[in-house]
């Protein structure tokens, strides 16, 4: 199965090079991250975004932090730094799992027996493993998804939301990876990509990936989804996930929940594509998922994308009256009852129940 040629994360000469997704599609530029603080900035300001890509960037951030030291930090110093990393974006579970995995290698009880050189080597090896593992998992889950669609080449209309492609992962993608794999399997696709307000990941990133791949597509505003489903034959809605609770409730980019409701009304299968890294069996349901609240100006203007000096990256554009208050939750939670199936590298979970999830990931 062919993977995407897009590479948003590169590790070269002990430096992390990130495709700056804030300036796509108009400009292709890269940010060099030389420190953990650079990685935190890149995650918080969405130079890099998408739960898998955030986690991988965090893993390399740990390596950069340790590589920049001449003596081993105390456990308290290390924990403080990694807590700062975790706080950069709290909703996706993937970043937390990276930090917990690193601490499992150097637990507090045995920390005195560790040494800096060993920690540096382990951190870099772990980050590189994460990069490779995510790509393999994306390719596998995309292959698994083919069983949900006709075996013979068919014309398929699919709606997707936000950006879940190579830009959001180590490569290939989750939901958009499924779409790529359907194309590679010979299906004739038309993709309807939600623009995904307010950050416009669908318009700026997914539409760009689809165009680069030559996959026929339409960009639609988020509030057009109902019209599209009522006037066109839609075969599936496929989205990604930032965190999946024990019962299957799924946190994903804001706007996913109403899309699932519309799909349910029209009898359109609604699939979540995610790797096992998005599962969080420590929480019973979606009410326990923390929802990141972002700045109001992301809703009220197009001037919210700024570089490290505060200079706008895009032309300023005011959308609302000065002083108007705005809500800006970055995610919402889709109840498991609205999800037809969860596509993973371990297989497809359907119906979506805690029993089936635990059976798959035990």
UniProtKB/Swiss-Prot annotation:
Q: Does the keyword Amino-acid biosynthesis apply?
A: yes
State its Enzyme Commission number(s).
Answer: 5.3.1.23
Per the record, the gene is: mtnA
Q: In which pathway does it act?
A: Amino-acid biosynthesis; L-methionine biosynthesis via salvage pathway; L-methionine from S-methyl-5-thio-alpha-D-ribose 1-phosphate: step 1/6
The residues that hold substrate are 49-51, 89, 201, 252-253
Catalysed conversion reaction: 5-(methylsulfanyl)-alpha-D-ribose 1-phosphate = 5-(methylsulfanyl)-D-ribulose 1-phosphate
Q: What class of enzyme is it?
A: isomerase
UniProt entry keywords in alphabetical sequence? Amino-acid biosynthesis, Isomerase, Methionine biosynthesis
Site (Transition state stabilizer) location in chain:
162
Q: Which residues form the active site?
A: 242 (proton donor)
Name the source organism.
Leptospira borgpetersenii serovar Hardjo-bovis (strain JB197)
Q: What is this protein called?
A: Methylthioribose-1-phosphate isomerase
The GO annotation for biological process reads: L-methionine salvage from methylthioadenosine
| Keyword Isomerase recorded | yes
């Amino acid at each position: 199965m062919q993977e995407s040629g897009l590479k948003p994360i590169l590790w070269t000469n002990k430096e992390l090079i990130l495709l700056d997704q804030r300036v796509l599609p108009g400009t292709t530029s890269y940010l060099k991250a030389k420190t953990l603080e650079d990685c935190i900035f890149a995650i918080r300001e969405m130079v890099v975004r998408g739960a898998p890509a955030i986690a991988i960037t965090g893993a390399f951030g740990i390596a950069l932090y340790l590589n920049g030291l001449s003596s081993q930090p105390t456990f308290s110093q290390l924990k403080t730094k990694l807590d700062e990393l975790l706080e950069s974006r709290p909703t996706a579970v993937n970043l937390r799992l990276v930090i917990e995995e690193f601490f499992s290698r150097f637990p507090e009880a045995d920390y005195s027996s560790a040494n800096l050189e060993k920690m540096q080597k382990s951190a870099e090896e772990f980050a590189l493993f994460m990069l490779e593992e995510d790509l393999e998992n994306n390719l596998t889950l995309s292959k698994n998804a083919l069983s949900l669609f006709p075996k013979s080449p068919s014309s398929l209309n699919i709606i997707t939301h936000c950006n879940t492609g190579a830009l959001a992962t180590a490569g290939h993608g989750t939901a958009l990876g499924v779409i790529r794999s359907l194309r590679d399997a010979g299906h004739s696709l038309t993709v309807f990509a939600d623009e995904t307000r307010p950050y416009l990941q669908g318009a700026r990133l997914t539409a760009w990936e689809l165009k680069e791949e030559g996959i026929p597509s339409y960009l639609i505003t988020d509030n057009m989804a109902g019209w599209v489903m009522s006037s066109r034959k839609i075969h599936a809605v496929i989205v990604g996930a930032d965190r999946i609770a024990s019962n299957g409730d799924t946190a994903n980019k804001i706007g996913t929940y109403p899309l699932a409701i519309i799909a349910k009304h029209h009898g359109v299968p609604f699939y979540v594509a995610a790797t096992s890294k998005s599962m969080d069996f420590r929480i019973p349901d979606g009410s326990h998922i923390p929802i990141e609240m972002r700045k109001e100006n992301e809703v009220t203007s197009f001037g919210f994308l700024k570089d490290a000096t505060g200079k706008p990256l895009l032309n300023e554009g005011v959308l609302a009256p000065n002083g108007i208050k705005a809500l800006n939750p970055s995610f919402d939670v889709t109840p498991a009852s609205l999800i037809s199936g969860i596509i993973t590298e371990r297989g497809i979970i359907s119906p979506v129940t805690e029993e089936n999830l635990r059976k798959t990931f035990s």
